[in-house]
Every structure is written in C-alpha cells, then in structure tokens.
Regions:
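Long, low-complexity, charge-biased intrinsically disordered regions
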Residues: 1-299
Length: 299
C-alpha cells in the first residue's frame, strides 16, 4: 500500500484474479550474520497464461566481465565506486490490467469481496523483470545517460570534466564517478525516482568483495567460497598448494551411478568462482566438468 502497488476494486466480468502469498526470508550481511528479516508479498505468476496475462518477459542483467572491467577502470583512473540497492525493485514497473486476490491477513472493512487491481508490478509476475528494466531505462535516458552498446545494463554519462557510470544487476547497483560530487549527484537523481538504500563505498557485489589498498583494488570471494564448502560438506578438508593432482587419472564411470545433480551443483559453484576471481582453477574445473554424465567417487 505504501508503494501504491494496488488498489481495491470490484472484479470486472470475465476476469479471474491471481492468487498471492507471503514469502518470509532472512537478509544476510557479507560476514554471514543476519541483517534483517523480510516479509514479501508475491503473486502466483505460475498461473498466468502466455499471450493472455503477459507477452514479453525477458530482462537483461550485467555480465560479470563488465563488472570486472568497470572495477579495473576505477583502479586505473582512481575513480570513486559506491553501491546502492533498490528497495522493492519490481514494484517500480508499470503494468497493464491485472487483478489479484486480497493478501492473507489484509482486512478492509466491508470490502472483503473486492480484489486488488495491480497498478505496479509485483514479485513473481512473469513480466515483472521486463517492466522494471524498461522503467529504469526510461529514467536513465531522461537524465542524459547513454546505454552501453555491449552491455545493456551499463549506463554512462560524461562531460569534458566529469564521468559517471551506473551498472545494474537486477536491484544491485554500482555507481562509479570521477569524483565524489558526481557520485552524490547520481545518487540524488536515483533517489528522486526510486526507494533506494545507500550502501556507501562498494564492499560486496554478487559475492565479490572489493577491498581498496594503496596500490589499487583487490577482489576476493572468501566468504562465498567458505559458504559453498560448508554447503557441500568440504569445509574441514585440508588446503593444497595446486588446484589439481597431476598424478590423478580420471576416467568415465562404467559402474553404479552417483548423484549427478549434486556434482553439477558443485561444478556450477566452482565455475562462478573461476569466472569472477579465481582463473587459476579453470583447468581443474574444466577437466572435472567433462565427467558430469559419467562420474565416480574419484571425481
């Protein structure tokens, strides 16, 4: 209600409202401690019918390579890099005519039979990501930012003396500026349009920790790596100096099958690490990924 996401109306003839539910979750800090508890109302978008309730759903996100290039630019030119988070991201997108049942626990006196007409997008709607990205594009273009041709989630604005870059990954945002005044102006502009959380100097983005030193910037994923080690019960294993044993010969499994899904999850987690900060494990991960369909205990 605070975001004017919906209003109560009588259900028009011939329309069927979508259901909704509350999702309860914990937001975690980079060090693994609890930041806050969150309750989010979501629509049961899985009941939507294509070409009737929605049409396009695609929404891009920035590439990890783009984030690394931008961080390299910051280090090279000694720019400022800050971070912001968009609160209730998908609630900013504007919608066509969609109706939803009243949320559980919401009671409007003498209006129990009415339904919610969605004014803005809601989480779990099929078109929610696309609507949000279109809205963000309009805001950035109207404020003289240009969309990068190689990455549609990178926005640039430059004059003869100042330079600003905004990099968007759904609701996480890196703001880069040639000086603090540019950063402040960009933050103020975004706050005028969206409900933003200012996170100050960039610290952690997508599990990548950014540490500033006297000689530049250091990227690491210590917390993320510890998290996946605990997830796959490998946290107590002893570290080794090289990522692969040269004397180990791997072969396809011709015996009993082993949990392929768990193995694929491990490979996927390791691939994210090597793409972000640890290219030194590329050979080992590439070699292990060849046996996804024919694995044994040695793998």
């Amino acid at each position: 209600m605070h975001n004017h996401t919906w209003k109560l109306v009588d259900l028009p003839l011939g329309n069927k409202p979508l259901g909704c539910k509350w999702i309860l979750k914990k937001n975690m800090k980079p060090d693994g401690t609890i930041d806050k508890y969150k309750a989010r109302l979501v629509a049961k978008g899985f009941k939507q019918k294509e070409d009737l309730d929605f049409f396009d759903t695609y929404s891009p996100v920035t590439r990890i390579t783009s984030i690394r290039v931008l961080i390299a630019i910051v280090a090279l030119h000694n720019f400022e890099i800050h971070q912001m988070d968009v609160k209730t991201t998908f609630l900013n997108g504007e919608l066509e005519e969609i109706y939803m049942e009243q949320p559980k626990g919401f009671g409007a006196p003498r209006q129990e039979k009415k339904v919610c007409k969605l004014i803005k997008s809601l989480y779990w709607l099929k078109q929610a990501p696309k609507q949000w990205h279109e809205k963000f594009d309009k805001v950035m273009l109207s404020n003289d930012f240009k969309i990068n041709e190689c990455d549609k989630c990178v926005y640039t604005k430059n004059t003869q003396t100042e330079y600003a870059i905004v990099c968007l990954y759904v609701d996480d945002m890196l703001i880069i500026g040639s000086n603090n005044d540019v950063i402040k102006a960009t933050k103020k502009m975004l706050t005028n349009y969206f409900d933003m959380k200012d996170m100050g100097v960039a610290d952690v983005i997508l599990g990548i920790k950014i540490a500033k030193t006297s000689s530049g910037l250091i990227l690491s994923q210590c917390h993320y790596i510890e998290k996946i080690l605990k997830r796959f019960n490998q946290y107590d294993d002893s570290p080794i100096k090289t990522p692969v044993d040269l004397n180990l010969h791997l072969a396809k499994n011709n015996g009993p099958t082993i949990d392929q899904l768990e193995y694929s999850r491990i490979i996927g987690s390791l691939m994210y690490v090597l793409n972000c900060t640890r290219p030194n494990i590329a050979y080992a991960v590439n070699k292990l990924s060849r046996f996804t369909n024919n694995l044994e205990k040695d793998h």
